Each structure stands twice: as C-alpha cells, then as structure tokens.
Amino acid sequence: MSPDLKKLKELRERTNSGLLDCKNALEATDNDIEKAIKWLQENGIIKAAKKSARIAAEGITKAYIKDNVAVLFELNAETDFVARNQLFIDLANKIQDALAANDFSDIEAANKVKIDGMTIEESCQDLTAKIGEKITLRRAEKFVAKPGEVVAGYTHANSRVADIAIAKGANQEALRHVTMHIAALNPSHLFESCLPKAQHDEIVNRINSDPKLANKPEKIQESMKAGMLKKEFNELGVLMFQPFVMEDSKTVAKYLEENQLTLLDATRYEVGEGIEKKVVDFAAEVAEQMKQ
C-alpha cells in the first residue's frame, strides 16, 4: 500500500524522522500513524545501537537547584551543533527534573530513572535515532540538604562547565558565589585533608626543615610555616587556600567563615573531560556512511 501523503507529512512532523523512513513505516503498517510511530521507534533502537560505538564527547553540563536538592549532570552528543538542538535541550530539561525528583546512587541508576514513560537511557536512544548522533547521560551527582544545610549551583553561560555544592549554614547566595569560584578556577582538591597522605607529609616535613626558620622565635616560626603551607596548598589548587575570585584579599575559607558557612562537599563537571576524542579519517567515514 502506498503511503497517504497527509499521513506521511504528519508522521514526519511528529517524529522528525527522514522521508524514506516514514514512507517505509507507513507502508509496513497500512498507513496507521500510531503503528508507524511504534515501527519507527523499534527500528530507531536498532539505528541507535549501530551508533553505540561512536564517541560522544560534546554536549552540556548543568547544575539544577530545586528547594533543598542540587543536581549536576553531563549529557553528551557527538557534536556541539547537536548540543544546541532544541530537542537535545528539551531532553536535558526533562532529565534535570527527573533526577531532582528521584533517588539514584550511580550513573546506572540515574539512567534507569523514568521520564515520559521511558528510562533516561531509552530516551537518549530515542533521540539518537531521531537526530542521528549518539546521545548519552554520562554522569550525574545529587546533593540533598538536611535541616541546617544549604545547596547551591552554577552553570557557566556556555553550559560546558557547571558545579554544585552543599554546606552547613543558610546563606545560599554566598555559597553560589563559591560555586562560581569553583567553576572558574577548577580546584584540584576541596580541603587540605583531601591531599594524598604521602604528598601532604612531604610538604609539611619540607617546610618544617626549611633553613629560613632557623634561629627564629617560635611564634615567628609558626607564622612563617602557616604562610608557607598556605602558599604551597594554593599552588596545588586546594580550594580553601585559594584567593577568593570575587575578593582576592581573602581566601575561600575566610569568605565561607564570614558568611557562616561550612563547606561539606562540591562537585564540578566540564564537558568531555576524561574522554579521549577519536580522530576521524573523513574519507573512511564517508565510505562507511555509503555502506549504511
């Protein structure tokens, strides 16, 4: 049976699928729109599976705050162009709402959270089939503030860097300023205690035996040691010792103290970090596309 032109147009508009795919779907389902959509979904999963070996290293990362919940996630695509596609943005917005409303312990559990009757993983596969690029939820983090705690987050304008934080206290605006600092300076560690013990011990021992301390009164020695440790930990990128980006006359630790905040945890994502991007032979890629 030849496809009905009106139904062909409707199917394309509802699914954003290609003309030939829609034609085949209608022919296979006797021009039944709903069955044709299901046919496209079933065949779309196959197409998505063929794309599973591709590397998705572009995309967005978002921080989302709702009441006492902070969610951070990275949604990947293969190209920056697709990451600006409205369908991709719509999916990201649905994911943020779903992750905020549901518990998850790791990325596998996050991908099983449901939106619109499908898991996040299935929704990514569905969008992969529609736009032709591999879409994946790569990672996600969630902080839930207890009474006496506060959460905050920051997403940079290009959505390539975002972070969330949780602290004891109530000043959310001040904590948000700290998340802006974290996004900008990308500290290597949050606290001195986060440094590997061997590295920390080496620094302390080296400073304690510094010749400049010789013959100095004890109080002056302690002051000099504190200054040298502060300088060393700042150079190593420890957040608490970094000059606060909005007021560099004080450290982040001092800024938090002034605002009655005690930082508990923070997480920062940058799109594609840790992913090895594949260098593609364009001629080979074209040849491969011609086989499909």
Curated annotation (Swiss-Prot):
Cellular localisation: Cytoplasm
UniProt keywords, alphabetically: Cytoplasm, Elongation factor, Protein biosynthesis
Against InterPro entries, the record matches this protein to: EF-Ts_dimer_sf (IPR036402), Transl_elong_EFTs/EF1B (IPR001816), Transl_elong_EFTs/EF1B_dimer (IPR014039), Transl_elong_Ts_CS (IPR018101), UBA-like_sf (IPR009060)
SUPFAM superfamilies tied to this protein: Elongation factor Ts (EF-Ts), dimerisation domain, UBA-like
GO MF terms listed in the record are: translation elongation factor activity
The lineage is:
Bacteria, Bacillati, Mycoplasmatota, Mycoplasmoidales, Metamycoplasmataceae
Chief localization class? Answer: cytoplasm
> What role does it play?
Associates with the EF-Tu.GDP complex and induces the exchange of GDP to GTP. It remains bound to the aminoacyl-tRNA.EF-Tu.GTP complex up to the GTP hydrolysis stage on the ribosome.
Q: Which Pfam families match?
A: EF_TS
The organism of origin for this protein: Metamycoplasma arthritidis (strain 158L3-1) (Mycoplasma arthritidis)
Which domain of life does this protein belong to?
Answer: Bacteria
Q: What is the name listed in the Swiss-Prot or TrEMBL entry for this protein?
A: Elongation factor Ts
- Report the PROSITE patterns cross-referenced here: EF_TS_1, EF_TS_2
Locate the region Involved in Mg(2+) ion dislocation from EF-Tu.
Answer: 79-82
- Family membership, please give it: Belongs to the EF-Ts family.
What the entry lists under HAMAP family is as follows: EF_Ts
Gene Ontology CC: cytoplasm
What Gene3D superfamilies would the database entry show?
Answer: 1.10.286.20, DNA helicase RuvA subunit, C-terminal domain, Elongation factor Ts, dimerisation domain
